[in-house]
């Protein structure tokens, strides 16, 4: 199945912040949406997930158009979202953070119990499962948030700067987690093949190497002295 959007436009008053953006991701694929602050990345995510409506353009899940569906209906159909900002429920335990979304989705008790144990184990949350969200480190919080997003078995998940507020050691752990999601046949918008947004429009798309080799990308975003280094995420994805 494919999640894709065509020619998305978003305006705020006279200012157009997203200008005809088209993106697609297949299940089991990791796609990056790159760009400097203010390029329109988060706004594009908001439109795809249903947080805001586009002024123009269309969004599809498989053959079904979902442009006008509210966010909760898109979530029910398999579109998950992890916000850039911390979204853990601060006064709830890690266990209850994960259980709460399954309860709202209507899963039965037996499924919730089994799925909780699977996620706690997969994300290395055993030692903090009873801890409140406010007590977690940046890496623990992010792992909890990703586990919660996966609790309802999404087909696709949009990760908006998932490494924000996370220490370097935890970043590597989360890179491995994201790479593992690909093997679970979940489509992810973050990096493998990438789109680079600049001033609301797609400047370039392709592999990381193709973006790094593009003179306009170097001039407007990466800088002339940029050197592409293979990250752990890419190594794990390609294994």
Mark where each language-model region is:
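Helix-to-loop junction immediately C-terminal to a conserved catalytic motif
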Residues: 49
């Amino acid at each position: 199945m494919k999640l894709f959007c065509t020619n998305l436009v978003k305006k705020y008053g006279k200012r157009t912040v997203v200008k005809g953006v088209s993106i697609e991701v297949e299940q089991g694929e990791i796609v990056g949406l790159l760009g400097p602050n203010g390029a329109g990345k988060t706004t594009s995510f908001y439109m795809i997930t249903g947080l805001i409506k586009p002024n123009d353009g269309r969004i599809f899940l498989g053959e079904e158009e979902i442009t006008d569906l509210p966010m909760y209906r898109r979530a029910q159909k398999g579109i998950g979202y992890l916000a850039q900002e911390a979204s853990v429920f601060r006064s709830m335990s890690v266990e209850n953070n994960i259980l709460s979304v399954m309860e709202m989705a209507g899963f039965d008790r037996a499924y919730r119990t089994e799925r909780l144990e699977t996620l706690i184990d997969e994300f290395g949350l055993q030692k903090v499962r009873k801890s409140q969200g406010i007590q977690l480190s940046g890496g623990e919080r992010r792992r909890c948030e990703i586990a919660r997003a996966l609790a309802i078995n999404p087909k696709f998940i949009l990760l908006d700067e998932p490494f924000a507020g996370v220490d370097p050691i935890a970043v590597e752990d989360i890179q491995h987690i994201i790479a593992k999601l690909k093997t679970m046949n979940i489509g992810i918008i973050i990096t493998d093949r990438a789109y680079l947004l600049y001033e609301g429009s797609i400047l370039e798309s392709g592999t990381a190497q193709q973006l790094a080799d593009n003179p306009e990308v170097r001039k407007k975003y990466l800088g002339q002295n940029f050197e592409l280094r293979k990250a752990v995420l890419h190594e794990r994805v390609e294994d």
